[in-house]
A protein has these predicted regions:
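Active-site-proximal substrate-binding groove within the catalytic cores of carbohydrate-active enzymes
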Residues: 41
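Amphipathic, alpha-helical segments enriched in basic
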Residues: 5, 9, 14, 44, ...
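Carbohydrate-active enzyme catalytic cores, enriched for enzymes
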Residues: 1-38, 90-91, 209
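CBM-like, beta-strand-rich accessory domains located in the C-terminal region of large
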Residues: 46-231
């Protein structure tokens, strides 16, 4: 809309057989004042592997390294049939939302009947990621992944603060439902190091506990005050 102040998000529908495809149906990016908070890592230096049968062994191509769930221990799969369904977009003066069923982006072993991912942005206030799911079985834990270039702090009370160029942000969630942990993603590819001006990214993993055949979760990201995590 010609403005760069406040929150901005973009989300992807489509399918997993698009030009220069990543397995990222339903993923999003989030910026604040035109600076990154939640990211798509992008793609590294092109190699023979990038355009060959081993393409999806590259971590940047995998749904696990996008802002997406791992369902029953199963990531999304490449192919035109692995696609978004039932998409809805709404925008008002105060709110923008995008909703999509991403269940069909996952293979059969995910045992997912429906997985409704909803993004809601309240302009200059917060960004909400809501997941509502129905599974046919619970074989392995399901995990909500967030990728960020921010520094991530999780205190002893499991409060989460992201700190980066865009400022400080609090991630709010149901601590009885989601158990957070972080992975450091080391960057060794020169192109990625240059793109992010750093040698590491962070993946936040929210494991759904206990496992549930059906349920709903919510992640809220909002600007944080410059106080300690325990305040």
């Amino acid at each position: 809309e010609g403005k760069s102040d406040g929150f901005f998000f973009a989300a992807k529908g489509g399918n997993n057989q698009e030009s220069h495809n990543h397995n990222d149906v339903g993923s999003c990016i989030l910026y604040y004042n035109a600076l990154p908070v939640l990211i798509d890592a992008g793609v590294g230096t092109y190699t023979r592997q990038t355009f060959g049968p081993e393409r999806y062994t590259i971590w940047t191509m995998q749904s696990d390294y996008h802002n997406l769930p791992l369902i029953n221990g199963t990531p999304q799969k490449n192919g035109r049939e692995f696609a978004a369904h039932s998409q809805q977009y709404k925008a008002t003066a105060k709110t923008v939302s995008y909703q999509v069923d991403i269940a069909r982006a996952y293979p059969q072993e995910a045992n997912v009947k429906s997985w409704i991912r909803n993004y809601t942005l309240h302009r200059k206030k917060d960004f909400i990621i809501t997941d509502k799911w129905k599974l046919s079985a619970c074989n392995e834990p399901s995990v909500l992944n967030l990728m960020t270039c921010c520094e991530v702090e999780i205190d002893r009370n499991k409060n989460i603060i992201l700190t980066g160029e865009a400022g400080r942000f609090r991630v709010e969630y149901d601590k009885k439902l989601l158990s957070p942990a972080t992975d450091t993603v080391e960057l060794t590819d020169p192109k990625l190091i240059h793109s992010w001006n750093r040698k590491k990214l962070t993946r936040i993993r929210f494991t759904i506990v206990p496992q549930q055949i059906s349920g709903e979760s919510k992640l809220v990201i909002r600007k944080a005050q410059y106080k300690t995590l325990n305040d």
